Design a protein with these regions (language model features):
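A broad "ordered helical/assembly scaffold" signature
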Residues: 11-14, 30, 180
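A long amphipathic alpha-helix within ATP-dependent nucleotide-binding catalytic cores
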Residues: 1-23
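Long, contiguous binding/interaction regions
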Residues: 46-233
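Conserved metal-phosphate-binding beta-hairpin within the catalytic cores
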Residues: 20-43, 162
Length: 233
């Protein structure tokens, strides 16, 4: 069973890595003593088109093209990339590193520590309709999450909502700008017309960052919140 899963995984990765492939047929496959031998294979190819490639797979694979290196204000290097399932433990540690004040500003209240199911939803996402960018940096031999920005798009991808939080001891390093610019650029590439977010009036750092990036800032006195809206495209 394990070797069959490994075979299917390799075929799937081949299809992901080679956008020219339109079909794969392996027939017959000889199975003996836990080993699989492909006796004949037929692979269909077509001319590669970048835009068409976005829709060729039912489930969008990990968008490795969005991974890039960034330099923080303290002149250290970090990696900006989409979140992935393997980040669950690092994401738990990231959440635990937030001060009560920063956590309150992010979630608009006091929440208990996230459990496995909640963390799974945060790290196992559908890249076609949502995105979570993290800035990750090696510290003491392991990858640590310094900040995260999330974008959730409507089904028609005309509007999107964002949220962002930076580790309490890493604020002032330019992480907010890096994460917000990544979220905005991703929305533009997806054809989103408007990106919006809500924060608390006391979250002055977020408000100033949004204003600097061109968001329209309005206050909802009835809800006691600040609305941030940016028109795109």
């Amino acid at each position: 069973k394990y070797r069959l899963c490994a075979l299917l995984t390799r075929i799937s990765q081949l299809v992901i890595d080679q956008p020219d492939i339109t079909s794969v047929e392996l027939n017959p496959i000889l199975a003996s003593n836990g080993q699989f031998l492909v006796l004949d294979a037929t692979i269909g190819l077509s001319r590669y088109k970048a835009k068409a490639n976005r829709k060729r797979l039912c489930i969008r694979p990990y968008p490795i093209e969005l991974v890039k290196e960034v330099t923080l204000k303290n002149n250290t290097q970090a990696q900006l990339r989409p979140i992935k399932p393997e980040d669950e433990q690092a994401h738990l540690e990231f959440d635990q590193s937030l001060s009560k004040e920063d956590r309150y500003k992010r979630f608009f209240g006091e929440l208990p520590q996230f459990n496995h199911d909640q963390l799974a939803k945060m790290t196992q996402i559908d890249y076609d309709r949502e995105m979570a960018f993290i800035v990750s940096q090696e510290q003491n031999g392991s990858a640590c999450t310094l900040g995260v920005s999330r974008v959730l798009m409507d089904p028609d991808k005309l509007d999107a909502e964002f949220a962002i939080v930076v580790r309490s001891d890493c604020q002032g390093l330019g992480l907010g700008t890096i994460l917000m610019n990544a979220a905005i650029e991703h929305c533009k590439n997806q054809g989103v017309k408007q990106i919006a977010g809500i924060t608390l009036p006391e979250n002055t750092g977020m408000i100033e960052l949004a204003r600097k990036l061109g968001f329209k800032i309005t206050r909802d006195f009835e809800e006691g919140s600040i609305n941030m809206v940016l028109k795109l495209n």
